[in-house]
From Swiss-Prot:
ATP binds at residues 156-163. One of its GO terms (molecular function) is protein serine/threonine kinase activity. The gene is hprK. The Walker A ATP-binding motif also binds Pi and PPi. Mg(2+) binds at residues 163, 204. Keywords: ATP-binding, Carbohydrate metabolism, Kinase, Magnesium, Metal-binding, Multifunctional enzyme, Nucleotide-binding, Serine/threonine-protein kinase, Transferase. This is HPr kinase/phosphorylase. Homohexamer. NCBIfam families: hpr-ser.
Length: 313
């Protein structure tokens, strides 16, 4: 897990920094957002480790509660809150008590303000950022495309043609997420893939070199991230002169990523095969398999065979 700091939060959500500018490198170690209701009512849950304290949010309800107290009481409550171990305080524009700002500046405590009009939307945005840093993460040497609305992780040994396949898929109006280094994150038991920031929008084609997909094809072919629903593994068509590839369309297996099982299929690569059409067909079949229209191919063949034999009697 990457180190997650107050600065990461402010950079991603463009918060106004009211105080504690020199403490933005403070690490946020606990997942989630806390509302300050109980703490403002003088109840502080004892933690063995200070790092268990979450970032704390205050908005309309907390403001209304605090405005009923005199100045001395408010200063005492805010001071207790800022000294209890929380890493940062976030307020919305709906928080009207200016005493908080006065106390935060006196203590040089990290206080941020958001202009999000709806508090629940702000909480969701913060949680989305947290997911990037706190969720289980892995890295795959692969490419990631979104094909017909389905996130497809394309694996295979180096030099087998993953990048070239991505380029062909882009020409077919499918969306490019990344190539070579794909970062996979488990968010609520769903695998989300994105490219390593260093390689964003870049692709390497042997014989040509590295070039920028945005500059050559435009922003319309780019996605920042995508759920991964299908893993396609490119394999050599023949190994030791034996063709082990599936010919009946029943060889769908599972590929485990961060504890989540993803549909997986191997596609043999050989000269003369149109990989783009094969990949598109594989994704189409995957979508059919998930739909109510799915019918097992062996059942279909068995049914047709019986009908054919019956017609010959």
């Amino acid at each position: 897990m990457e180190k997650f700091t107050i600065k990461d939060l402010t950079d991603n959500l463009k918060f106004e920094i009211i105080s504690g500018q020199d403490k933005l490198d403070t690490e946020i170690k606990s997942y989630g957002i806390n509302r300050a209701g109980l703490e403002l009512a003088d109840y502080f849950k004892p933690f063995k480790d200070q790092s268990e304290w979450r970032a704390t949010l205050m908005s309309t309800k907390e403001s209304g509660y605090m405005l009923q107290f005199d100045e001395e009481t408010k200063i005492k409550k805010y001071t207790q809150l800022m000294k209890c171990g929380i890493p940062v305080l976030i307020i919305t524009n709906k928080f009207k008590d200016k005493t908080l700002i006065k106390v935060a500046k006196r203590l040089n405590f990290p206080l941020l303000r958001s202009d999000y009009p709806i508090t629940i939307q702000l909480v969701q945005k913060i949680q989305d950022i947290y997911d990037i840093y706190f969720s289980p993460t892995a890295e795959e040497h692969a490419a990631l495309m979104n094909i017909f609305g389905t996130g497809v992780l394309i694996k295979g040994k180096s030099g087998i043609g993953k990048s070239e396949l991505c380029l062909d898929l882009i020409k077919h109006n499918h969306l490019f997420i990344g190539d070579d280094r794909i970062i996979l994150t488990n968010k609520s038991n769903k695998i989300i893939g994105r490219v390593h920031p260093i390689l964003k929008n870049l692709i390497e084609i042997r014989g040509i070199g590295i070039f920028d997909i945005v500059k050559s094809n435009g922003y319309q072919v780019i996605m920042n991230e995508s759920p991964v629903e299908l893993v396609v593994e490119l394999v050599e068509y023949k190994e030791q002169n034996i063709d082990n590839s599936d010919r009946l369309g029943n060889d769908w297996s599972k590929f485990k990523i961060l504890g989540v099982e993803i549909e997986h299929i191997q596609i043999p690569v050989s000269a003369g095969r149109s990989l783009v059409n094969i990949i598109e067909s594989a994704v189409a079949q995957f979508k059919i398999n998930k739909s109510k229209q799915f019918e097992n191919v062996f059942d279909v063949i068995h049914k047709r065979t019986k009908e054919f034999l019956s017609s010959k009697k």
